[in-house]
Curated annotation (Swiss-Prot):
InterPro entries (UniProt xref): Met_Sox_Rdtase_MsrA_dom, Met_Sox_Rdtase_MsrA_sf, MsrA_MetSO_reductase
One Gene Ontology molecular-function label: L-methionine-(S)-S-oxide reductase activity
Name of the molecule in the record: Peptide methionine sulfoxide reductase MsrA
Pfam family, one: PMSR
Species of the source: Methylobacterium sp. (strain 4-46)
Function: Has an important function as a repair enzyme for proteins that have been inactivated by oxidation. Catalyzes the reversible oxidation-reduction of methionine sulfoxide in proteins to methionine.
Entry keywords, A to Z: Oxidoreductase
Taxonomic path: Bacteria, Pseudomonadati, Pseudomonadota, Alphaproteobacteria, Hyphomicrobiales
GO term, biological process aspect, one: cellular response to oxidative stress
Family to which this protein belongs: Belongs to the MsrA Met sulfoxide reductase family.
Active site: 54
Catalytic reaction list: L-methionyl-[protein] + [thioredoxin]-disulfide + H2O = L-methionyl-(S)-S-oxide-[protein] + [thioredoxin]-dithiol; [thioredoxin]-disulfide + L-methionine + H2O = L-methionine (S)-S-oxide + [thioredoxin]-dithiol
HAMAP family, per the entry: MsrA
């Protein structure tokens, strides 16, 4: 990842970069499964956005779930600047988070399994950072538009917060909200660790299991 001045606070309105009216070019197809990155997706496929630090490693966590995952992509969300570049996002002056778009079939892969992967794959108590990756674009975020899915996400947060407290961790700082516009990241970011298996991945969880109370089954069950 690139290293810019590390902002630990969201930009003020008069600091927001202007962006551009047209989308940036990105990959047409998923490097791993060959499906169209942007869709349209088949009937019954739902989408959710997850921010859990550097999106290179985060995306791999989700495409590796296998059955039920239609496609994954990385991009920028929960910010203000239209059609931002990666370099602009890294300045902290667009307001965006690095996120993974997950298109999945809930009949095969329950949303709860995505939640479990999300919570267990990063430390959601770190605020505007994940490990050595510091900045507003690395904040923990969960973005869904469906009210029922959002309620499910909030319930999982509350259950996981109890599990974390029991192990001595601080409060969860994850934002859960409507996704707003999602902007696909540049082509070279898509499925980055499939193209570069030895590439950077700073992702690390807390070691605390997502509790059964979230309605999620473990892989051993």
């Amino acid at each position: 990842m690139l290293f810019f001045r590390k902002r630990a606070e969201m930009p003020a309105p008069d600091q927001i970069l202007p962006g551009r009216p047209t989308p940036l070019p990105t990959a047409e197809r998923h490097f791993v499964n060959g499906r169209a990155l942007k869709g349209p997706y088949p009937e019954g496929i739902e989408t959710a956005l997850f921010g859990l630090g550097c999106f290179w490693g985060a995306e791999r966590k989700f495409w590796q779930l296998g059955d039920g995952i239609w496609v994954t992509a990385v991009g920028y969300a929960a910010g203000t600047t239209p059609n931002p570049t990666y370099e602009e996002v890294c300045t902290g002056l667009t307001g965006h988070n690095e996120v993974v778009l997950v298109a999945y079939d809930p009949a095969v892969l329950p949303f709860g399994q995505l939640l479990r992967t999300f919570w267990e794959s990063h430390d959601p108590t770190q605020g505007m950072r994940q490990g050595n990756d510091v900045g507003t674009q690395y904040r923990s975020g969960l973005y869904v538009s469906d009210p029922e899915r959002r309620a499910e996400a909030e319930a999982s947060r509350d259950a996981y917060a109890q599990a974390l407290r029991a192990k001595g961790f601080g409060s969860i700082t994850t934002e859960i909200r409507d996704p707003g516009p999602f902007y696909f990241a540049e082509a070279y970011h898509q499925q980055y660790l499939a193209k570069n298996p030895a590439g950077y991945c700073g992702l690390g969880g807390t070691g605390v299991a997502c509790p059964v109370g979230t309605g999620v089954r473990s892989a051993a069950e």
